[in-house]
Amino acid sequence: ESDVCSSDLDTLTMTHTVTNTGATPFSYEAALHTYFRVSDVSQIRLTGLEHAHYEDATNGFAPCEQPGEAVTFDGPVDRVYASTAAVELHDEGFGRTIHVAKSGSAQTVVWNPAEPYGVLVNDSVNEEWRHFVCCEAAACREHAVRLEPGESHALTQTLSVA
């Protein structure tokens, strides 16, 4: 495995590369866990996932489809979208848009525990859950990466702020 990060004034690029140096094939799952600080999770929206299919982890990974509108947060959200599209996080409270571009990824994970779920899993205490959202490139579940001997796979995510 190798991880590489590079940045300039406008962007941050993260790449996670796995190489099968063994003699037998294997599968693995990966996600580039990015937790963005937001002004108020109930006031932000994610665009780029409209009409994408997803599995809802808050409901036993039930298959769903995102309506033709932005993802918003009015309760617990734990979704694995089958989408390679770039995503934009719009946060008017902080006056910014974060652009998330991905490659080597068949999925996008979106997560915020909300209350009371965040308290139950002890991942988010007090009101901290109101001020972050996770939006990340992923290769998991049925989209796990299979590597034959000698093969490599790179999962890359590039973030930029406007």
Question: What feature does the model see in each segment?
Answer:
Residues 25-27, 35-109:
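Active-site/ligand-binding surface loops and adjacent short beta/alpha elements
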